[in-house]
Structures are given as structure tokens and as C-alpha cells.
């Protein structure tokens, strides 16, 4: 059972919250997380890159020069890959880069990644509670009160963030907001600090406990 110190939005300590998630064995955790990240990045690829082979390039019915008598190597088409304007040999074609990983492994990888970052977690009882209207500077000042540097990449995890909070965070380059039930391994590992709302911790327990 891991205990996380909770803070108020003004940076003062308010108590503790417990988070206990089942993780992968130490011997297999690195491989599991690696495969989960590879899958996530691969599945983001569009796979729409496409080139033309010699048979697909427009033209090419004409021989560039006669078969014999020139002293040069014979060529049958002006669209051979050996000539400018010719086709591409083994070029990319549209394809799917999607990788499979079963749901049980995906959940285990996510829990393992999250628990491995527990020392970088800031649990906040009332994130953005003073915000009445979208204001980027209030979020930046609030993160500073929580002990987070402006140069650090921050992942903010909330249960059901308001539109005011969404708009306030949207304009901050190094801060990303994500819902507690939409976590992913890459964002968890990519951030320097994780700021989690107390209600989001309860949501994480509910959604990812098993």
C-alpha cells in the first residue's frame, strides 16, 4: 500500500491518500511497458505514405534509345528506377502499423507505469478551485506553489475537469490535461511530474484496480 501526501491548491499540506495497484513482476515489467509504448506510438501512425513503382509512373512506353549500337547498357523504359523521373524501388505503400496487445496486458502496463512514477506524484485536493474564469497565469502560479518548476513537463490528471480548467491549461506548452479514465503509458512516462486530483485517484482505483 502506497501513501501519497495530499496538498491544497494553495500548496499547504492537507492529509494523505492511499493508492494500491497491482503491478507486473520486476523481471518482466520493463518489457511489458516497452511493448505498451511501442504499441501506442505505432498505432498513432497514419501509414499513408505512398510512392509510385515503375509500372505506376505516368509514361514509360518508349525506349530511351535503341537496343544496339550506342555502347550503353540496354534500357527498355524511360521510367526505370535508374533514371530521373522513374519509379521507386521498394518505396513505402499505404499500410497499417497497428500492433496488438490484449486488454489485460495493457491495464497491467499502465498500472505498473503509474506506480513506478509514484515519487513524482503531487496529489491535490482541490485543483484549480479558485478559478472563476479561464486564466493561464493562475494555473502556472498554482503549479509553482505545488513545487513544480516552469521547465518541467507536467501531466495533470483530473476526474471531470471543468471547461474553465481545460481552457486555462490548453495554452501552457509543457502542461497536458487528461481525464482519469483515459490514461496512457506514454504520457505517464513522458512527464516530469504528475499532478493528480484527489477525486481522480478514486477514479483510478475504480477503473484500473483490476
Curated annotation (Swiss-Prot):
Gene3D superfamilies: 3.40.1370.10
GO CC entries: ribonucleoprotein complex; ribosome
Any one GO MF annotation of this record: rRNA binding
SS bond list: none
Superkingdom to which the source organism belongs: Bacteria
Keyword Ribonucleoprotein in annotation: yes
One Pfam family named in its UniProt record: Ribosomal_L4
Residues covered by region (Disordered): 46-89
Amino acid composition bias (Basic residues), ranges on this chain: 60-71
Keywords annotated in UniProt: Ribonucleoprotein, Ribosomal protein, RNA-binding, rRNA-binding
One of the protein's GO biological processes: translation
UniProt keyword rRNA-binding present: yes
Protein's job: One of the primary rRNA binding proteins, this protein initially binds near the 5'-end of the 23S rRNA. It is important during the early stages of 50S assembly. It makes multiple contacts with different domains of the 23S rRNA in the assembled 50S subunit and ribosome. Forms part of the polypeptide exit tunnel.
Family: Belongs to the universal ribosomal protein uL4 family.
Subunit description: Part of the 50S ribosomal subunit.
Protein name: Large ribosomal subunit protein uL4
Originating organism: Prochlorococcus marinus (strain MIT 9312)
Gene name, Swiss-Prot/TrEMBL: rplD
Amino acid at each position: 500500500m502506497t501513501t501519497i501526501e495530499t496538498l491544497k491548491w494553495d500548496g499547504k499540506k492537507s492529509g494523505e491518500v492511499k493508492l494500491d495497484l497491482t503491478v507486473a513482476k520486476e523481471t518482466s515489467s520493463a518489457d511489458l511497458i516497452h511493448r505498451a509504448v511501442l504499441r501506442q506510438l505505432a498505432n498513432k501512425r497514419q501509414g499513408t505514405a505512398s510512392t509510385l513503382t515503375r509500372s505506376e509512373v505516368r509514361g514509360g512506353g518508349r525506349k530511351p534509345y535503341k537496343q544496339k549500337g550506342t555502347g550503353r547498357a540496354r534500357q527498355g523504359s524511360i521510367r526505370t528506377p535508374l533514371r530521373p523521373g522513374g519509379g521507386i524501388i521498394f518505396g513505402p505503400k499505404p499500410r497499417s502499423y497497428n500492433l496488438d496487445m490484449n486488454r489485460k496486458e495493457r491495464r497491467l502496463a499502465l498500472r505498473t507505469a503509474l506506480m513506478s512514477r509514484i515519487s513524482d506524484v503531487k496529489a491535490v485536493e482541490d485543483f484549480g478551485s479558485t478559478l472563476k474564469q479561464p486564466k493561464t497565469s493562475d494555473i502556472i502560479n498554482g503549479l509553482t506553489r505545488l513545487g513544480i518548476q516552469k521547465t518541467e513537463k507536467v501531466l495533470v490528471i483530473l476526474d471531470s475537469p471543468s471547461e474553465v480548467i481545460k481552457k486555462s491549461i490548453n495554452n501552457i506548452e509543457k502542461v497536458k490535461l487528461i481525464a482519469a479514465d483515459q490514461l496512457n503509458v506514454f504520457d505517464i512516462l513522458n512527464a516530469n511530474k504528475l499532478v493528480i486530483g484527489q477525486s481522480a485517484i478514486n477514479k483510478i482505483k475504480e477503473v484500473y484496480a483490476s
